[in-house]
């Protein structure tokens, strides 16, 4: 049986930690930044850990070798 392919869109947007959690960048930072306060913009920097259910769905359906 051939190897399963990873969805390349998911590969670009999410990463797995060593403990198996899924990391994604914060949403809401592409446009309409003028209406946001400086504190909101600052809090949108960096990455966030997805909730366990969303992380499970990402690993199960889009990262075929993400679930051990």
UniProtKB/Swiss-Prot annotation:
Entry GO CC = cytosolic large ribosomal subunit
Entry keyword Transport: no
Q: Organism's domain of life?
A: Bacteria
Tell whether Transferase is among the UniProt keywords. Answer: no
The GO terms this record gives for MF are: structural constituent of ribosome
| Stretches assigned to coiled coil | none
Q: Which key words tag this protein in UniProt? A: Ribonucleoprotein, Ribosomal protein
Q: Name the InterPro entries on file.
A: Ribosomal_bL35, Ribosomal_bL35-like, Ribosomal_bL35_CS, Ribosomal_bL35_sf
Which GO biological process entries does UniProt record here?
Answer: translation
Which Pfam families does the UniProt record give? Ribosomal_L35p
Family under the similarity heading = Belongs to the bacterial ribosomal protein bL35 family.
Q: What is this protein called?
A: Large ribosomal subunit protein bL35
Q: Which organism is it from?
A: Rickettsia akari (strain Hartford)
